[in-house]
Curated annotation (Swiss-Prot):
Cofactor annotation remark: Binds 1 zinc ion per subunit.
GO terms (BP aspect): base-excision repair
Annotated PROSITE patterns: FPG_CAT, ZF_FPG_1, ZF_FPG_2
Catalytic residues in the record: 2-3, 60, 264
Protein name: Formamidopyrimidine-DNA glycosylase
CDD domains: EcFpg-like_N
Chemical reaction(s) catalysed: Hydrolysis of DNA containing ring-opened 7-methylguanine residues, releasing 2,6-diamino-4-hydroxy-5-(N-methyl)formamidopyrimidine; 2'-deoxyribonucleotide-(2'-deoxyribose 5'-phosphate)-2'-deoxyribonucleotide-DNA = a 3'-end 2'-deoxyribonucleotide-(2,3-dehydro-2,3-deoxyribose 5'-phosphate)-DNA + a 5'-end 5'-phospho-2'-deoxyribonucleoside-DNA + H(+)
Cofactor requirements of the protein: Zn(2+)
Signal sequence interval, chain numbering: none
Residues annotated to bind DNA: 93, 112
InterPro entries: DNA_glyclase/AP_lyase_DNA-bd, DNA_glyclase_Znf_dom_DNA_BS, Formamido-pyr_DNA_Glyclase, FPG_cat, MutM-like_N-ter, Ribosomal_uS13-like_H2TH, Znf_DNA_glyclase/AP_lyase, Znf_FPG/IleRS
Species per Swiss-Prot/TrEMBL record: Cytobacillus firmus
E.C. designation(s): 3.2.2.23, 4.2.99.18
GO molecular function: 8-oxo-7,8-dihydroguanine DNA N-glycosylase activity; class I DNA-(apurinic or apyrimidinic site) endonuclease activity; damaged DNA binding; zinc ion binding
Length: 274
């Protein structure tokens, strides 16, 4: 699933491609992707003649801001957007097509069909699901080690599970939680409330640095991820533990282990992470 670095990269690349384009029509080939409004015809009608003014990211969500409508899009497992000329053949698994007045098309592809799209009046999108109750952005001033300490001091959850909870800090998923914990030398099965003030400060720094570096490298292309221009990310080349089961730790040479924490496959170094 695309996490913060991948979604941020998609946002940046799409911004270069589609800002200022106006919707001339929409083709929906898989109606289940459209969640709000539930009626596909209403979805199409609301976006007709709307111009894309900006694209934002909130956690793992893309927010397409039109004249008076915001489309909240979640890529889920394998969703992707690409800009095409209308004459180009449709790629496999194309489920929603946004036809622009200049003849180009923004096409949404999704092998798994898990992605979602919601429309809301501009200004209301943060107050309702799926954005309501999301935690702080990890690149914001509000994200501090003190925030983590306060959020986790009364929980009995393991630190990996706690970090995956989008109500505390957004954008972290399986890849970057594993990587941040590795950098912080913290075992993923440690109870979150057991971390000391010093350990939490190290973890906070590891989260921010991991995400910053991943964004700089365009995210991680583990499976099918590409950005809005069809380019792969490069951060997978720097992964310390994720996807490296039985490979030597880059720090100590011990074989990386894989276990299950909170129902999620979890990679760690048994020597470096305590």
């Amino acid at each position: 699933m695309p996490e913060l670095p991948e979604v941020e990269t998609v946002k940046r690349t799409l911004t270069e491609l589609v800002i200022g384009k106006t919707i001339a029509g929409i083709t929906v080939k898989w109606a289940n992707i459209i969640k709000e409004p539930a009626d596909v015809l209403e979805f199409e009608t609301l976006l007709m003649n709307q111009t894309i003014r900006s694209i934002r990211r909130r956690g793992k969500f893309l927010l397409f801001e039109f004249d008076d409508i915001v489309m909240v899009s979640h890529l889920r497992m394998e969703g992707r957007y690409g800009l095409y000329e209308k004459e180009e053949p449709l790629p496999p698994h194309t489920h929603v097509i946004f036809h622009f007045t200049d003849g180009e098309e923004l096409r949404y592809q999704d092998v798994r069909k898990f992605g979602t799209m919601h429309l809301f009046p501009k200004g209301s999108e943060e107050k309702v699901l799926p954005l309501a109750h999301l935690g702080v952005e990890p690149f914001s001033e509000q994200f501090t080690s003190e925030l983590l300490m306060n959020a986790f001091q009364k929980t009995n959850r393991k630190i990996k599970v706690a970090l995956l909870d989008q109500k505390t800090v957004v954008g972290l998923g399986n890849i970057y939680v594993d990587e941040a914990l590795f950098r912080a030398r913290i075992h993923p099965e440690r109870l979150a409330h057991s971390l000391s003030k010093e350990e939490m400060a190290v973890l906070h720094k590891a989260i921010v640095s991991t995400l910053e570096e991943a964004v700089e490298m365009g995210g991680s292309s583990i499976k099918s991820y590409v950005n809005g221009q069809g380019e792969m990310g490069m951060f997978q080349q720097k992964l310390g533990v994720y996807g490296r089961k039985n490979e030597p730790c880059r720090q100590c040479g011990t074989d990386i282990l894989k276990t299950v924490v909170g129902g999620r496959g979890t990679h760690f170094c048994p020597n470096c992470q305590l």
